[in-house]
Amino acid sequence: MFKYTLDNKKYHTLNYFYKTKFNSKVFKVSLNGNFSCPNFKNGNGCIFCSHGSGDFAGNKEDDLVTQFNEVKTMMEKKWPHAKYIGYFQANTNTYAPLDILKEKYETILKLPNVIGLSIATRCDAISDECLDYLEDLSKRTFLTIELGLQSMHDKTLKLINRGHDLKSFDECVKKLKQRNINVVVHIINGLPFETKDMMLATVKYLNSLKIDGIKIHMLHVLKNTELEKLYNETHFHILTKEEYIDIVCDELELLNEKIVIHRITGDPTKEDLIEPTWLIKKFCVLNDIDKEMVRRNSYQGKRKDN
């Protein structure tokens, strides 16, 4: 049995990480802090964006406590002793003056059974002043900073209009790690015109940064995005389910086994999705990844030194 799992998975599951660290069931509560994104200044933001990553975050019309309690009330019916992490998910959650950040974060930290915060942001939206505050937060609670990279290749970053290059991302991660702040990185498989080798190179690069966790996504083309326009114009290749599973299993084999796998596929809404339609069946994808790892007699980190 693979060491970092409780349910026969062949990779380091988030459930295992939380259970061993906190000895409790832990839920991340997605929150919408009504933030914006600096990349909207560059036009329409990232070409895959539906104007506010975090489509399943709370209702921004509700205050943060209301958003949080709505989820907690449901969860505690089945798990009355659960603990919670406030997940600032929608848009760029450090893109505001420091006093506003403090007010939003501290409001959630004061709530009962909250053991930490997870803050989704961008490498170009964390000032030195903000870094100092995040370091302080990390000493008081379990803090995770989630950064979108998507790809290590500057050519791709420019194509998808990320608004930053690899150097900026690299410098940001190193600053966070120097302050002992947990870092989780988002990557996307199947970005336009990327080869399998390019996707695997991104994972090898992240190994070298000694990140704490990763979220692996499959590129999905959503309605009313710039990506939809590019897809209609170029008909770039969309990974098949079989191709995606093969790439993910290779990535798991390359990733250091201590890196926690926070996500291994996406779950876009059926109404907004154009391609790939196979992504709708999330649990089929997860099961097929498990089957392929078993078929390979493999596990996370098996080829980490390759």
Provide a role label for each language-model segment.
Residues 1-85:
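N-terminal [4Fe-4S]-dependent radical SAM core
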Residues 2-16, 20-27, 213, 221-306:
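Auxiliary Fe-S-binding modules of radical SAM enzymes
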Residues 75-79, 105-112, 132-142, 174-178:
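Acidic (Asp/Glu)-rich catalytic clusters
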Residues 167-226, 242-265:
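Conserved C-terminal portion of the radical SAM core fold
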Residues 52-71, 75-98, 113-126, 142-168, ...:
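Core AdoMet radical
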Residues 72-75, 126-140, 171, 200-210, ...:
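Short amphipathic alpha-helices and their capping/turn segments at secondary-structure boundaries
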Residues 27-31, 84-86, 117-119, 143-147, ...:
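Hydrophobic faces of well-ordered beta-strands that scaffold small-molecule active sites
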Residues 35, 90-94, 123-125, 149-153, ...:
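Active-site-proximal loop/turn and secondary-structure-junction residues that shape catalytic pockets
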